[in-house]
């Protein structure tokens, strides 16, 4: 992917507008989870070091477009940044007709979703964003699959449009895993439904040497192999699709499972052979033999893409399968990339964040890239780089 990178540009004295992903949870005016801001800090610091007159914007929550709503203000983010940065930081509410910024200063432009035309990407709004800056930096991979005013429109009209370090890193990592994977490549796809991951499974079946399915998705494949899945989450209408994928791709069939009688934190767990599942069983995890077989596959891989847990890891009695997979990824010398909300929660639970080569910050954007879809905000940067 050929895009201009912020790291390669001279930003001294230039008005720089960064579209970041600062969509963080806020309670009582305080940021309660700072992961996305922490991920953006290196971009902010680098731009300031380069002498930029720096502006940054983001969406936060889902306000009614075109209306100011204090509940969705970026003020808590501004207060957080004041504690983390040594430069002046202030919030600008009305900025579309221009904003004064000094070199070495950071001005946070209020929630871009307060601006009418943001979601529809109106040309009028896009041109107003573009007029604010000499250089536009797209650094919000999590919103790269949306063609909105602050992600796409501004990049059409800004004098220079480039990728920030976070976005560039994400594209490099995804490219390494998806476009030129070192082989063998193993893709692990978990989650509850085949239907929501069907295009992901079809796309990966063409790229991966081994496709591993887990979670509710695996139940549909177990049923497709002719086994009883009891009361488990299973999409019986997609059994033929699962059979077709299993025939075309190397998908290891689960040999043992962990079952319970109901979906609850206190339900006892029982390990069973996949052929012993009864009508009142619910499959909540892969069994130890299957987990070990998958761990061996992972240990022999050169590239690993992980999206989705293989069991109900939130309940400890059904977490072992996901834990074994997570630890195998952590111990594997392969290049590994992980993405998706549940996957990140599993990585946190099992404490392997520093052992995964790259953790993707984008949920929907990550999946759309894996599906082989064009991300509009990346496509416009490529177009501008050619020009």
Curated annotation (Swiss-Prot):
Main localization, broad class: cytoplasm
List, alphabetically, the Pfam families matched: PGK
So where does ATP get bound? 197, 314, 340-343
Q: Known catalysed reaction(s)?
A: (2R)-3-phosphoglycerate + ATP = (2R)-3-phospho-glyceroyl phosphate + ADP
Q: What's the EC number here?
A: 2.7.2.3
Q: List the GO molecular function terms.
A: ADP binding; ATP binding; phosphoglycerate kinase activity
Which biological process annotations from GO are given for this protein? gluconeogenesis; glycolytic process
- Residues the record lists as binding substrate: 21-23, 36, 59-62, 113, 146
**Where is this gene product found?**
Cytoplasm
Key words of the record: ATP-binding, Cytoplasm, Glycolysis, Kinase, Nucleotide-binding, Transferase
Under which pathway is this protein filed? Carbohydrate degradation; glycolysis; pyruvate from D-glyceraldehyde 3-phosphate: step 2/5
An example of a Gene Ontology cellular component annotation for this protein is:
cytosol
Tell me how this protein assembles: Monomer.
Q: Which PANTHER family match?
A: PHOSPHOGLYCERATE KINASE (PTHR11406), PHOSPHOGLYCERATE KINASE 1, CHLOROPLASTIC-RELATED (PTHR11406:SF23)
The entry sums up its family as follows:
Belongs to the phosphoglycerate kinase family.
**HAMAP family per the UniProt record, alphabetical:** Phosphoglyc_kinase (MF_00145)
Protein name as annotated: Phosphoglycerate kinase
Q: In the UniProt record, what gene is named as encoding this protein?
A: pgk
